[in-house]
Amino acid sequence: MKVQVDEELMRKLEKLALISLTDQERQEFMRDLTKILDFFNKIDELNLEGVEPMFHPLSTGKLRPDEPAQPLSRDDALANVPKKKDGYIIGPSTIGG
């Protein structure tokens, strides 16, 4: 199914994404979106008859068993931390100041 990327579609997408684009940005996004959708159309053209569906990329992968191990000591954990105080990591402020 070919989707026509036009001004109307772009304005709908802008509204849904709660963004406002300039005319130049809209034209750039239209070109980019057209390329992306063309790639998906190429995938649709593939003959996948006889190919088993893959539900998860790791379904046949080999994972190591989840076994408890010795954790890092506090000193080792804080060794490369740029800011710390009283044995705790100091991170950036996320509220206000």
UniProtKB/Swiss-Prot annotation:
What Gene3D superfamilies does the annotation carry? Glu-tRNAGln amidotransferase C subunit, N-terminal domain
Keywords tagged on the record: ATP-binding, Ligase, Nucleotide-binding, Protein biosynthesis
- The protein, known as: Aspartyl/glutamyl-tRNA(Asn/Gln) amidotransferase subunit C
UniProt subunit comment: Heterotrimer of A, B and C subunits.
Please note every region of biased composition (Basic and acidic residues): 63-78
Q: Which organism is it from?
A: Metallosphaera sedula (strain ATCC 51363 / DSM 5348 / JCM 9185 / NBRC 15509 / TH2)
Coiled-coil spans are: none
Q: Example GO biological process term?
A: regulation of translational fidelity
Asked if the keyword Membrane belongs to this entry, the reply reads no
Q: Which InterPro entries match?
A: Asp/Glu-ADT_sf_sub_c, GatC
Report which gene this protein is encoded by: gatC
Role: Allows the formation of correctly charged Asn-tRNA(Asn) or Gln-tRNA(Gln) through the transamidation of misacylated Asp-tRNA(Asn) or Glu-tRNA(Gln) in organisms which lack either or both of asparaginyl-tRNA or glutaminyl-tRNA synthetases. The reaction takes place in the presence of glutamine and ATP through an activated phospho-Asp-tRNA(Asn) or phospho-Glu-tRNA(Gln).
